[in-house]
Amino acid sequence: MPDTQELQYTGFEQIPVENLNPLVSRQMIWGERTMLARIVLRKGAVVPEHHHENEQMTYIVEGALRFTMGDGRVITVGAGQVLVIPSNLPHSAVAIEDTLDLDIFTPPRADWIAGTDTYLRR
């Protein structure tokens, strides 16, 4: 993916699938200021607690994720629903069904681009 601003036109079938662990895979595309990630989580997949400077929007295409926020709130997000997570709010998630989600980040996740997101690779 480019490091500079340029026009991109593609489909997810052309974006490589990155298998992060046996239960989670993702595809990513990004521009100068925004990243879109297509994430597949099998039932029981766990995204450990983490936080990031990036604002995050999670849209559940199918399935459901149960998020636990650093302040103790538990929010179940199902198909057709969107969760907006502000910058630096600790959060974790569990796939309570096989789930397809689209995550939007601004700015793009530098750790994902560099492959240094070890919390997801366990």
Residue ranges of model-derived segments:
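A cytosolic small-molecule/anion-sensing beta-strand core signal
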Residues: 61-62, 78-79, 97
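Conserved short histidine dyad/triad with adjacent acidic residue
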Residues: 35-51
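Short, conserved beta-strand element in jelly-roll/cupin
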Residues: 41-42, 52-67
